[in-house]
Regions:
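Short alpha-helical hairpin
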Residues: 3-22
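His-Asp-centered metal-binding catalytic motifs of divalent-metal-dependent phosphohydrolases/nucleases
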Residues: 54-71, 75, 79, 100-109
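Hydrophobic, well-structured mid-protein blocks that either form specific transmembrane helices
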Residues: 81-117
């Protein structure tokens, strides 16, 4: 257990940084080394804030997307299997800890309809999200352009706002797992924009123009 230090165990960090993290170099831009190191940093911040085991939170974050070596739709399940089957982790963790860690990795997907089974699942699910308003706006526009090429600018705006209301508004389906997190503050910023479509349209128009420039 490692709840007293503000950092995970040095030998565990050395193992993860040399044996685990390099695997992310093979994944797409949204799940690359920059992504996993961001999830690790956020996980450690949340774990320290709530007094969770830093070694567990660190390792869960490091393994959470390894399943992207296979089909994306089940990558969270595959990632959990990779973690539980890695016998090298027994050097640092008990079988019970590893079971909790496997379940946390399985529960990390933000689209999961049920709550993560433990605080560790909640930590990695929250750390894996990016609710920075400008990032959400840009990604939603990018998704619309890629998947609905037949829509004109007005059509994209309508689809964009439908998605914003459905997922991120006060009545949306997004659920935050840890109160007082950075994500809670960012979600409130986004909700203020959703509640004022004229302000949101200014952001939409700017990013839409950037994403369609040169077409």
């Amino acid at each position: 257990m490692n709840t007293l230090s503000q950092n995970p165990s040095l030998d565990l960090v050395e193992f993860v940084e040399t044996q685990i993290l390099p695997q992310y170099a093979a994944f797409d831009k949204a799940h690359n080394m920059e992504h996993v190191t961001t999830v690790i940093r956020r996980s450690l911040d949340l774990a320290a804030k709530i007094g969770a085991d830093l070694d567990m939170a660190y390792t869960i974050a490091a393994y959470h997307d390894l399943g992207l070596s296979g089909p994306r739709a089940v990558h969270h399940i595959t990632s959990g299997k990779i973690l539980i089957q890695d016998s090298r982790l027994k050097r640092w963790f008990s079988q019970e800890q590893l079971r909790i860690m496997k379940e946390a990795v399985e529960d990390h997907r933000a689209s999961a309809s049920r709550a993560p089974r433990s605080i560790y699942g909640k930590i990695v699910a929250e750390a894996d999200r990016n609710i920075e308003p400008e990032t959400v706006i840009r990604r939603t526009i990018q998704y619309g352009l890629a998947n609905y090429p037949e829509l004109d600018a007005d059509g994209h705006w309508q689809r964009f706002m439908e998605h914003m209301n459905e997922k991120y508004s006060a009545n949306g389906y997004i659920r935050l797992w840890i109160q007082g997190s950075e994500n809670e503050r960012k979600l409130n910023e986004l909700r203020q924009l959703i509640a004022e479509p004229k302000k949101m349209k200014v952001h939409f128009d700017r990013f839409f123009a950037e994403e369609t420039a040169g077409e």
